[in-house]
């Protein structure tokens, strides 16, 4: 019985022998009986052995499962790198096959997927500068408006103050004039002026005699009585002592309007309380 000897064929890219023009381009099987081990499949399982037919001889070429690839002419440096990568991936482990295939797959750039050209990027710094400028302008306008409002308010307050001061000055001047005129009226009239001799009785019972002008009002008579008696009379009225008696609560009327004659007696009556010392 003959011995089956396995035959290992070296890969064509590792061969250092340069083929000549006289070498045959096809591989010639030897006359010896050989058995070739088939390589593993892509799934990592061994393929079943081929059964030879009974009528086939030992040295027939059909006993061989497959013929080796043709030997390429030229040095290993002339061979393409893609062939080497394919051979190396076929010789690797089955588990590493997907990773190697993914690594060898050409990566498509993102620019090839875009249908339209990429727009230029917006300068963010210019936008920030524009925002800062707008904020600064708004702030300045707000400050200006607030300053104007304060100025208007201050001017209105000053105008109101000046108006109040003017009114106060007018009132003071008027009161001074009235006091001066009243002081002149309190003085007794001269002999050349028309005058009335009146006797005035205070609420406390004190009496005094004095000359008054017919144009003097009843308030002047009351003030002269306060000055003479050194007292203050409030809520007072003046009445005549002759019969029938007449009472005057409106002290703004003059003696001539009230019909008071020369050498009349007038009494000061206080409605509430007594005279204040």
Swiss-Prot record:
Modified residues (Phosphoserine): 88
Subcellular localization(s) per the UniProt record: Cell projection, Cilium
Swiss-Prot/TrEMBL keywords: Cell projection, Cilium, Cilium biogenesis/degradation, Phosphoprotein
Composition bias type Low complexity, residue spans: 60-77
Polar residues: bias regions: 16-31
GO CC annotations, alphabetized: cilium; intraciliary transport particle B
SUPFAM superfamilies on file: Ubiquitin-like
Ranges where the record places region Disordered: 1-102
Keyword Phosphoprotein: yes
Source taxon at top rank: Eukaryota
InterPro entries linked: Ubiquitin-like_domsf, UBX_dom
Keyword rRNA processing on entry: no
Ranges of biased composition (kind: Basic residues): 35-50
Domain UBX positions: 191-268
Physiological role: VCP/p97-binding protein required for ciliogenesis. Acts as a tethering factor that facilitates recruitment of VCP/p97 to the intraflagellar transport complex B (IFT-B) in cilia. UBX domain-containing proteins act as tethering factors for VCP/p97 and may specify substrate specificity of VCP/p97.
Record note on quaternary structure: Interacts with CLUAP1; the interaction is direct and mediates interaction with the intraflagellar transport complex B (IFT-B). Interacts with VCP; the interaction is direct.
Protein's UniProt name: UBX domain-containing protein 10
Record organism: Mus musculus
Gene giving rise to this polypeptide: Ubxn10
């Amino acid at each position: 019985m003959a011995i089956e000897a396995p035959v290992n064929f070296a890969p064509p890219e590792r061969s250092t022998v340069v083929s000549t023009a006289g070498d045959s381009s096809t591989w010639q099987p030897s006359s010896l009986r050989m058995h070739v081990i088939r390589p593993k499949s892509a799934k990592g399982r061994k393929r079943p052995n081929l059964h030879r037919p009974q009528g086939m001889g030992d040295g027939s070429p059909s006993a061989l499962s497959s013929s080796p690839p043709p030997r390429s002419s030229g040095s290993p440096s002339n061979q393409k790198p893609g062939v080497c990568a394919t051979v190396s991936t076929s010789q690797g482990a089955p588990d590493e096959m997907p990773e190697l295939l993914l690594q060898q797959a050409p990566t498509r750039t993102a620019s090839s997927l875009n249908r339209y050209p990429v727009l230029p990027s917006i300068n963010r710094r210019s936008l920030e500068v524009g925002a800062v400028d707008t904020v600064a302008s708004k702030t300045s306008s707000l400050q200006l408006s607030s300053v104007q409002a304060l100025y208007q308010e201050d001017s209105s307050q000053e105008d109101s103050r000046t108006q109040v001061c003017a009114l106060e000055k007018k009132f003071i001047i008027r009161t001074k004039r009235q006091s001066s005129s009243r002081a002149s009226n309190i003085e007794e009239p001269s002999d050349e002026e028309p005058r009335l001799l009146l006797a005035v009785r205070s609420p406390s019972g004190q009496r005094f005699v004095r000359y008054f002008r017919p144009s003097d009002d009843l308030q002047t008579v009351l003030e002269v009585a306060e000055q003479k008696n050194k007292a203050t009379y409030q809520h007072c009225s003046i009445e005549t002592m002759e019969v029938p008696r007449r009472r005057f609560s409106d002290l703004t009327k003059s003696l001539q309007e009230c019909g008071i004659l020369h050498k009349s007696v007038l009494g000061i009556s206080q409605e509430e309380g007594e005279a204040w010392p």
